[in-house]
């Protein structure tokens, strides 16, 4: 796994270490190392990390992985992949915190534009291009698993921006949304996720993510277009594929009704 990692080392709660001889991941790393050497390439060892996804509270088996027999790979709690912070507990508060911080760090653009006499339209375009775009980065990955607190914190970014843009004319967030013909960030993220799901559903390469429901048994309930993804845990139920499946199923059912 490559990316920008959190430097903190994961605590060994139980002291269990996976024997390298029984570690299939080590076999894959060895194959990758041999492939790189054969093709005269080099693995960036500083950016290669290990992340353990384990929800057990009693056993914490850490894989002891090495490259070139002399470099042990660091085990991390979180890592940044393509701009998104992924945690080993599959929660998104670190990623949400990063997004909000970036958005507020650009709020000075609006204040400076206002200071130098920019009109509402110019400030609004700046907000859309420079701030809102950041708040939506890779949202199909994490939107389904946001907590209510995270949803509110993200929405506050747009509330603040519209208040700055409207200035003395600002009365309420609802009025500002109506004035600019905007949807809330929550509604917009859901729309973006649905758009992504529809594109994936229509793409032959990714359509297998959303298998069609071929059940022919007649019931009183409306037949779902896609096979629902079953989950034993709420954590998995809020992960990308089950979340996008439910969004797309709901969308297709609405189309059938019309």
Question: Which stretches of residues belong to each language-model region?
Answer:
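Active-site palm subdomain of RNA-directed nucleic acid polymerases
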Residues: 1-16
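Conserved pre-motif C helix in the palm subdomain of viral-like polymerases
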Residues: 1-4, 128, 240
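Catalytic palm subdomain of template-directed nucleic-acid polymerases
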Residues: 12-37, 55
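Hydrophobic packing residues in well-ordered alpha-helices of helical domains and bundles
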Residues: 25, 29, 43, 96, ...
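Short, conserved micro-motifs composed of acidic
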Residues: 27, 34, 42-77
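Basic, alpha-helical interaction scaffolds
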Residues: 72-141
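Acidic, serine/threonine- and proline-rich low-complexity regulatory regions
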Residues: 111-124, 141-149, 173-184
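Short linear motifs embedded in intrinsically disordered, charge-biased segments
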Residues: 147-258
